[in-house]
């Protein structure tokens, strides 16, 4: 069964990133976190390079792409931690530029950026803020929502009180 990416939506400061960190720690998997507003199409897909090729006995030149900075970071994390499974967490997913959105949709659907795939054993989680909290945020269309399992987060006084009591927080 193919795991659909998880999409956490909620106001700024609600703890979306901390939730992913806690899940990774408690399950013993790796975590690579990226804020997508800091990326361009090139850093997500990789940079073009010209390579020499041969086909049907003829030489020609073609364009290939270096590995995505994001995918490369996952492999670096795997090497550093020796963990073969993990979560690629894409934050502020609904604030990316229009030129990057097709690559993001490809990642959500196929677990690839360009021609480079997310390693087996890694899943995608993403987060965003509803547009009412961020002028740069946009609502997702149905094509995007069909690719993810959405979870809406909101503040809860009871949850905060339980957390505060467990961690010695008091006025």
Residue ranges and their predicted role:
Residues 1-171:
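AAA+ P-loop NTPase catalytic core and its hallmark functional loops
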């Amino acid at each position: 069964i193919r795991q659909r990416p998880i999409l956490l939506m909620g106001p700024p400061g609600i703890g979306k990133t901390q939730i992913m960190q806690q899940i990774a720690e408690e399950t013993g998997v790796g975590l690579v976190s990226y804020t997508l507003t800091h990326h361009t199409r090139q850093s997500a897909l990789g940079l073009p390079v010209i390579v020499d090729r041969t086909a049907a006995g003829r030489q020609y030149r073609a364009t290939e792409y270096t590995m995505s900075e994001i995918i490369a970071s996952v492999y670096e994390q795997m090497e550093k931690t020796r963990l073969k499974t993990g979560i690629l967490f894409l934050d502020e997913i609904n604030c990316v530029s229009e030129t990057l959105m097709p690559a993001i949709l490809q990642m959500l659907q196929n677990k690839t950026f360009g021609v480079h795939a997310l390693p087996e054993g890694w899943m995608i989680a993403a987060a965003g803020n509803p547009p009412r909290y961020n002028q740069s945020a946009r609502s997702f269309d149905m094509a995007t929502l069909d690719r993810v399992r959405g979870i809406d987060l909101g503040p809860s006084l009871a949850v905060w009180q339980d957390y505060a009591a467990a961690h010695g927080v008091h006025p």
